[in-house]
């Protein structure tokens, strides 16, 4: 069973990385500005999904723990990218794009916290809804 978790995380990681790459290319087709919108949007979606997953899906035992780990660590872990965020910020600073770099860092941190909060709130709301309907966690 221990080997299975590595396979699940690996496959989910491949799918997350491919999803990030495809979504990044798609956003770049429509966004031709200095601000790194693709990475920001991908990371914000990832913050929401991880918070929702760990709050709702994991507590409801809807999926086996191995699948939840695969989605959280594998898919969402490879879908989001702190390293790209960091490199893009340094590139903006090196090109003297100070205001864009500040906006990017601010939106990433505050937006990530807000999206995580929304994901948690949605998960918590859905759990309470199921409990009031008589369902069990």
Swiss-Prot record:
GO biological process, one term: cellular detoxification of fluoride
Residues passing through the membrane, by range: 4-24, 37-57, 62-82, 100-120
Residues at which Na(+) binds: 77, 80
Activity regulation text: Na(+) is not transported, but it plays an essential structural role and its presence is essential for fluoride channel function.
Primary subcellular site in the record, as a coarse category: membrane
A GO CC term assigned to this protein in UniProt: plasma membrane
Record field: catalytic activity: fluoride(in) = fluoride(out)
Subcellular location: Cell membrane
Record key words, sorted: Cell membrane, Ion channel, Ion transport, Membrane, Metal-binding, Sodium, Transmembrane, Transmembrane helix, Transport
Membrane topology: Multi-pass membrane protein
GO molecular function: fluoride channel activity; metal ion binding
HAMAP family given in the database record: FluC
Family under the similarity heading: Belongs to the fluoride channel Fluc/FEX (TC 1.A.43) family.
Annotated function: Fluoride-specific ion channel. Important for reducing fluoride concentration in the cell, thus reducing its toxicity.
Annotated protein name in UniProt: Fluoride-specific ion channel FluC 1
Provenance organism: Bacillus cereus (strain ATCC 10987 / NRS 248)
Gene: fluC1
């Amino acid at each position: 069973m221990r080997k299975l978790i590595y396979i699940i995380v690996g496959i989910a990681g491949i799918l997350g990385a491919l999803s990030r790459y495809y979504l990044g290319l798609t956003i770049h087709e429509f966004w031709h500005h200095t601000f790194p919108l693709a990475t920001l949007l991908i990371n914000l979606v990832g913050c929401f999904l991880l918070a929702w997953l760990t709050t709702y899906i994991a507590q409801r035992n809807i999926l086996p723990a191995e699948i939840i780990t695969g989605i959280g660590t594998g898919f969402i872990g490879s879908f989001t990218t702190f390293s790209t965020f960091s490199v893009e910020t340094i590139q903006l600073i090196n090109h003297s794009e100070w205001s864009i770099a500040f906006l990017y860092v601010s939106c990433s941190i505050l937006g990530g916290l807000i999206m995580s909060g929304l994901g948690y709130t949605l998960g918590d709301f859905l759990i309470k809804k199921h409990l009031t309907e008589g369902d069990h966690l």
